[in-house]
Amino acid sequence: MLTPVVSYSTVREVKGPLLVIERTRGVSYGEIGEVVGPDGEPRKVQVIEVATDYAVAQVLGGTLGLPSKGSTVRFYGKTLKIPVSEQLIGRILDGKGQPRDHMPLPPPEDFRDVNGEPLNPYSREYPEEPIETGISAIDGLYTLVRGQKLPIFSGTGLPHNMMAAQVVRQSTVRGSGEEFAVVFVGIGIKTEEALFFMDEFRKTGALRRAVAVINLASDPVAERILAPRVGLTIAEYLAWQLGYHVLVVMTDMTNYCEGLRELSSGKGELPGRRGYPGYMYTDLATIYERAGKAHGKKGSVTQFPILTMPNDDITHPIPDLTGYITEGQLVLSRAMWGKGIYPPFDVIMSLSRLAKDAIGEGKTREDHKDVANTLIAAYSKALELRNLATLVGERNLGWRERRYLRFADAFEQKFIKQGYYERRSFEETLDIGWDVLSILPEDELTNARPQITQKFYRRHIFESVAV
């Protein structure tokens, strides 16, 4: 039990989830303590602003029923730390790191600061090994790399929750002796969504290798800010101390940013773009930059954050700033979803900046880079020809152009589209890629090396497709 070192009965104001404490001395940013109201119930607090004669603290348990008069705040001179253990795998926690599954916490192996320890840039190792998600659009075109941070840009009503559950369930790393774990962080999600994830993880057995940190929309907003940091702290312990390759799936980062805006407004700060605080870029970086690999460490931390773009606007501050920090983005398309295609990836708008270094012989398969480059180039050309066909009619196109239209249909229906419970290996994904590419004439596949085309091209498929 921590011994309080400073105690104040000078709470000036309770403002939303915040306390304003007057005449403070020696209180530090990030310091933890507790506030006790007239009812005698202690609630954990964390300092989020320090001035010469006052401090602002967020109440992690909410301020409902907490008056300013008669409340006492005690500070402990320490930052917020949570107990971590390998036995947390298989457990469900809340945004503060406390059990949500009605079981006691396992004996702690260590206590870790939720703000983490920044990786020295010199100690970082360049990510070059893939994670197999079992989803062709990701594995085949925009491969997720161990130590990468690759977000999904989604929209309201799109199936990003299904994708998050599928990635948690299916993802793995290849290689004997490689330990793999998933940390799932639900940020400000509805009870219905939380029940979906928990039922899915339990039913499929995914929870046996996962830690779930669930922050509900009804939980205090201060806990929403804490939840991703709690999840990442657990992930870092598993990676750096125990050698796990950890995939951190976080949804929905838009809820996190809305919570950040709410706290900023409560502190009376000047708003930035669209009301978000001017330091949102820096704040997001403190989360995203905790991904990576380190020299001399066996494990890695990979981030797969999901955010919903307000009004499908990719220039909105949340996706805009996220794109600056992360190493690519996977964009979901409302048009593809409207055509009944799951997962509804927008292939042209998506990008993985590190994929090129994690694919190929010895990592996935020798033809992987050729397949990815050729599929994207051919699909881009096919989309242009689709627009042309709506103007002049498909019959007025040449036979090669009509082949591209057949290719685009097959690419969407066979390669991109797959079942929610369908898992494809790298080899299966690449084979399907060659199946759809073989609809095109062999001399059109100029983005693939000739020796690769000669080895994998399926001429019988080309001959069987009528145009």
Swiss-Prot record:
Keywords: ATP synthesis, Cell membrane, Hydrogen ion transport, Ion transport, Membrane, Transport
HAMAP family noted in UniProt: ATP_synth_B_arch
Family: Belongs to the ATPase alpha/beta chains family.
GO biological process: proton motive force-driven plasma membrane ATP synthesis
Assigned GO CC terms: plasma membrane
Tagged with keyword Iron-sulfur: no
Subcellular location per the Swiss-Prot or TrEMBL entry: Cell membrane
Coarse class of the protein's main subcellular location: membrane
Described purpose of this protein according to its UniProt entry: Component of the A-type ATP synthase that produces ATP from ADP in the presence of a proton gradient across the membrane. The B chain is a regulatory subunit.
Keyword flag Transferase: no
Quaternary structure (record): Has multiple subunits with at least A(3), B(3), C, D, E, F, H, I and proteolipid K(x).
Bilayer topology annotation: Peripheral membrane protein
Name of the protein in its database record: A-type ATP synthase subunit B
Region (Disordered) residue spans: 95-114
UniProt cross-references to SUPFAM superfamilies, sorted A to Z: P-loop containing nucleoside triphosphate hydrolases (SSF52540)
GO MF terms held by the record: ATP binding; proton-transporting ATP synthase activity, rotational mechanism; proton-transporting ATPase activity, rotational mechanism
